[in-house]
Amino acid sequence: SYGYRKIIKKNIIKNLKRPIINLHISYLPHNRGADPNFWSFKNKTPKGVTIHEIDSGIDTGDILFRKKIKFLIKKDTSFKHTYFILRNEIEKLFKKNCTKIISGKYSKIKQIYKKKLKLKKNLPKKLNWDTPIKKFII
């Protein structure tokens, strides 16, 4: 799953022979839920991408692979710019580990999450893709 905004029902997950995986553009367990790119800057948490198993929670499944990403934020760097970098990085992480995912040859990292889930409705109203990060956050 990537960009899928629906919650998969517990009975469907339970009855599958293999786990469902999700490609998430945050460095889990930080910034679970919607719009993790924004929240990573707002809350000054690590930025990155994660491939994890889907469980009955929202972005709470075991971590399979993840990568931290460092951004050089200039005056005009927008959320759109950083989103496309994250999207590119999650694709590269998936391609690099696709064979391991298919074969099931990977180690799992249990998530320990203490932070609150981020919801789309919590986003500031004035935020848009072209908003410069420095203007809005820093």
Question: Can you say where each PLM-predicted feature lies in the sequence?
Answer:
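Donor/substrate-binding cores of folate-linked one-carbon enzymes
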Residues: 2-134
